Every structure is written in C-alpha cells, then in structure tokens.
Amino acid sequence: MDEMEELFGETADGLFAVDQNQRIVLWTAAAETLTGIKARDALGHPCHILEGRDEWGESICTKDCHIFQALRQGQPPPSDDLIVRRPDGRQVRMTFSVIPLQKGSAQAIIIFRENRLRGWQEIVDRAAAQLPAPPSTAALHVRLLGPLSLILQGCSLDSPPLTRPKVQKALKYLLAHYDRKVPKEVLMEFLWPEEDEEMGYRNLRVLVHTLKGALEPHRPPHQPSHFIGQEGGCYFFRMDAGVWIDVDAFQKHLREGEEAEKQGSPAQAIIHYEAAASLYRGEYLEEDLYEDWCAAERERLKELYISLLTKLSAFYAAAGHYEGAIDRLRQALAKDPCRESLHRNLMRYLWWAGQDTEALRQYEACRRSLAEELGIAPLPETTRLYQRIAQDLGDRRP
C-alpha cells in the first residue's frame, strides 16, 4: 500500500483502494477533499460508508454491491455516477471508475471525481455579462413578451393614435406575424368581421395610414413607410429596416443554445439560454390574455420558456451550482405550478443542496397545487422521493 500511496497520492482525482472484504486500505488526500471524510474515519471501514445513492435516493453503496459482484465474477466492473453526501450536508455527484487489482478478486482501486461543469461560476458570470439588449443599429425596438413596448430611436412610442383599439390591434397582429406577409383580406376579417369587403378595405387603408404616421411621425408626406411594407395586396413589417423584436431574439437564442448543446459546448448553451430567459419579461401580449387569436402562440412561447429553464437547472445541478438550479426551477413553477416533474426536480436539488426540510416542504406545495387545481394526488415516484428524503433526514437526526 505504501507503493500505491506514493504512486497515486498526489492525483487530483479522489482515489481509494479496498481489500477482498471491501474494507478501505488506502484513502488519498484528494479523496478527503472531495468527500469531506478524513482518512482516519475511512481506513479500515467498509467502502459503503460513502453511502452513494442514485438520483432517486436509492442506495448503491451497499455490502456486496453490484460492482463487487462483478469483480468477484471476473467481469468488467461498471462505472457509475453516484450522489455522495458530505459530512457538511452537501450532496455531490461523483463519477466512479473501478480498476481490478486481481481477476476474480474484490481487491480494487476506485478513482472518482466530482461530476461537474468545470468553471461554472465563470460561465454564469459570462452569461450575466452578455445578456442581450436591442442592437444600437435597430431603429425600432419592439417587446411583445410582457407589456407591449415600442421604442423608436430611444423614445417611447405612445402617441394617441397608437392607443386607439383598432390601430393597436392591427399593430399587434402585424408584429405577431413579423416573419410573413399578411393578406389584406385577413386583416379586414380580423378587424371588421361584420363589414362588407368594400367598407372593410376602406377602413383598412385609413387605419394603415394612421399606423404609419404614428410609427414615423416625422416621415415626409407621400414618402413610403420605412417600417410597414405593402406588396401584392399584403402588409408586413420590414424586418430588414432596423426592426428588433424580442420574440425573434428569444427564439434565435434558443436555437443557438440547442446548437451549442449538439456541439458539446455547455458553456455556450448556458449563455444563450440565459440570454433567452432574460428576454421573457412576461406572458406574450399579456394585455390580450383573453384574445383567442394569440392564445396558441402565448402557450407555445411559455412552453419554450419553461423548457429552457428546466435545461438551465439541469446544467447548474450538474455543475454543483444548486442555488442556480433551484432558482431556475422556481421561475418555471411560477409559470406552471402543476408541473409535477418540476416539483420533483426541485425537491431533488434542494435535497442535494442540504436543504432537506425545504425539500419536504416542496412536496407539500406540489401536493396542494395538484389537489387544488387538478383534484389529483402526486405520482408514486414523487411520493417515493419524498419518503426517501424524509428517511434520510430522520437517519441523520440525533
């Protein structure tokens, strides 16, 4: 063992060795640092003092566990990700690799490291520093997520013409369909469903003229609009004319985050997902919550928002940044208090962060939301997680 200590003692990865009876015979300084368990408390004890569990709280580190069964049978031992509770209450995700010392024997070296995204704090700081703002080159900044906001060259557009119900409704419809051309017949039916075609078209021409003037108060007479185009009987926003829309930017950041994930770059994915999350200031066209025409898009964007928050929470949890993971899940639950999978993940991350009591309270919050809103009870897997946390808390109480 002295030779092994000399060989492996300086490695940054945690390392310990066990004998035929699964008793720890070597425990390096890095193992102390990662687990919080001193060598004097580990040496001579069974290796299941680590109390490694899976993410559901089920014990994996047990006497004659599946790893040592494989060793004794001369089979390749599996590598596992385990959740290990440190003496300070914090739970950390570890990746373990097992090296047999002799075929058919339980003697082995176990190398482990904390499974976390390296440099997560730097990533979080970079994400915060790169939160998006409308580009200075954009003349018109439009926000549809949350209260409608239009900023023209630094000044808010809120002149009386834009507050007229029909003008504002037409403006919102064109902005909502910023990526396509809208036929005049569609606008006429949307704004004046009871009018005949002739009267509807007359009304539309007057309204569009008013809208152009409100968006460009200093446009010379008879000059074409810089922002609203007209072509082939269709109206549309000229996105190439310096128009920035938050929904467009939100979806671009989502796509770039997904692409970064595919390319194996979690740091870039986090930056883009955080950028997208910062753009979601509220419900899509929140002044029109009871309008059917934008309900489907509102729900779609909300689902995208919840999904990206869930991804961020998973990234942060993998990085050991449980505060960030917890915060993102709470933001997601604010949008959908009955999403049981969010409650479950939040319980798990609170538990891993050493906030066992808060994790149990989260189960009660989940149970109340489901009962009050849907008239149902939590799923068995949620209840099992609650019981596992409660048992763990009880086991550690004096």
Show which residues each predicted segment covers.
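Sensory modules in modular signal-transduction proteins
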Residues: 1-32
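PAS/PAS-like sensory domain cap-loop motif
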Residues: 31-46
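Terminal output helix/cap of sensory domains in signal transduction proteins
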Residues: 49-90, 382
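Short loop/turn elements at sensory-signaling interfaces that couple input to output
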Residues: 96-109, 115-118
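Short boundary/linker motifs that mark transitions into or out of structured domains
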Residues: 117-168, 225-235
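DNA-recognition element of transcription regulators
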Residues: 147, 162-172, 197-219
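Short amphipathic alpha-helical recognition elements used for nucleic-acid or partner binding
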Residues: 158-191, 211, 251, 340-346
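Intrinsically disordered, charged and Pro/Gly-enriched terminal/linker segments
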Residues: 176, 196-199, 220, 232-398
